[in-house]
Amino acid sequence: HSPESKITTIDRNPEMIGFAKENFAKFDNRQQITLLEGDAVDVLSTLTETYDFVFMDSAKSKYIVFLPEILKHLEVGGVVVLDDIFQGGDIAKDIMEVRRGQRTIYRGLQRLFDATLNNPGLTASLVPLGDGILMLRKNQAEIELPDVD
């Protein structure tokens, strides 16, 4: 029960958007949830608020693309949780052992790990829950990440 809390969610899938709207209409009596429709890469750059907590469950290869913009909007001391980061165990393999169709995801996740696990501006924790969670705590206002291009 957090009457002061606000939730902002981003989705681009029309079916999931419809499902979310139905549920928010039924259960969001205090109107604490804002649904932003569109691709996260476009929507994130339009945000003006800051956040204490961000949960990411999207295209795994895009986590590293979304992260710089998310960190801009995350309060110092805030936490980002990234879901399903072990890629069914593939992430621990050599890239040549990963199926060709999964290699873009593999590369994106490797870039994410390279950018975050030893970053002095972040505290990173890998949690072996389900298909893996990466928890990042923002320790300072400015976080330097390698270029994502």
Regions found by a protein language model. Name each.
Residues H1-D149:
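S-adenosylmethionine/decaboxylated-SAM
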